[in-house]
């Protein structure tokens, strides 16, 4: 079965993306976290950062007019929504010395394990490479960890996210080098297709 089309997210997609994030957490987190952790994550992790859409670094997959997967990358300092509002969150990263961030990956429960997460990660890698980045980092919740490992991310450390309501959620800091292009410039053509 072919993947549903991927495109860059736009501001009018925000309500549908937020709904998908919330539903994905409620669907998938109970397999990894308890009821309190799932409920807290639905409030504080399933939160769309509009800066990703404004920066044109956030992708969606649509099937039958509905967004079924979303995720992206950032060239800014903020690593994840739950990281709080630090003074330098919006700072642009230096691609020569700092890694790009993979951000806010969510797949609707009935669309998991069909390649959508991988397709978004591939789009993120192409776009970050085109901007000169050499590495990707992310803060994974436990439901996403298997996808990231399968894509070649390695664990840096395990850590605890403390939500604003005091609930703690186990997470994993991960990284992956961005592979250099081998021959031709197919990557720039692929990146151009992602933005169409």
Language model segments and positions:
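A short beta-loop-alpha structural element at the N-terminal edge
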Residues: 5-19
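Small/polar loops that bind or transfer phosphate-bearing groups
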Residues: 9, 103, 139-140
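Conserved GNAT-fold acetyl-CoA-binding loop/helix
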Residues: 25-47
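Short loop/turn motifs at secondary-structure junctions and domain boundaries
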Residues: 49-55
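Conserved acyl-donor/pantetheine-binding loop and adjacent beta-alpha core of acyl/acetyltransferases
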Residues: 55, 62-64, 68-112, 127, ...
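Conserved acetyl-CoA pyrophosphate-binding loop and the N-cap/start of the following alpha-helix
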Residues: 111, 115-123
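Conserved GNAT acetyl-CoA-binding A-motif
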Residues: 121, 128-141
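C-terminal "cap" of GNAT-fold acetyltransferases
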Residues: 134, 141-145, 151, 158-196
